[in-house]
Amino acid sequence: ELSRLPGINFNKNLQYLLNYPHACTEQITSQGFPLLFIFDFTRQTDEEKTRNSEKVDEIIRILSSRQLPDGGFMYWSGDHYASEWVSTYAGHFLTEARQKGFEVSEVVLSKWVQFQQKLARNWTPTNPYRNYYSLSMPQLQQAYRLYSLVRAENTESGAMNRLRELKDLSIQARWQLAAAYALTGKKDVANELIFNQS
């Protein structure tokens, strides 16, 4: 090994991930994300590839079943309202899954994009939508939403520019927004967000 960091026991951690017992939408999404990229970091047998791909397909089905008519995703099965953060996270996962070649419903993604666009366009720093996430990190939530839309090839430039103009933009939101700008090819704006913090 060339790294000074201790090795990661992928097999042990993957087994834990595959058998993770918790089932809110955020936890299910967290279970799925590493499975999308594990093929990039480890060699796997055909059996392991099949098992991991089947798990991703299962997660896609579960997440799709938790989408509400407005396009957002519920935090817990049976909820009747969308969680903004979880909607961004679940939709981001579904976008990445589709880009990795997994089958994701166009209807699910389209409804999610519309939900995200509506929230992105109507977002203000004093957003009246109140829950744990929006009270604790509204700027990061908006920056991540904008990033996820860029990943889904539905850039909201106006909303990105409005967020960028905030005087007290948090460091976390700056970095997330910088990533969104970088993906759109505006690396100069991304660098300005990161290095010119005033």
Could you say what each language-model-derived stretch is?
Residues 1-136, 142-147, 151, 157-161, ...:
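Extended, solvent-exposed functional surface patches
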Residues 8, 188-189:
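Primarily extracytoplasmic ectodomains and periplasmic/lumenal surface modules that are beta-strand-rich
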Residues 157-160, 189-193:
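Solenoid-repeat scaffolds in large eukaryotic assemblies
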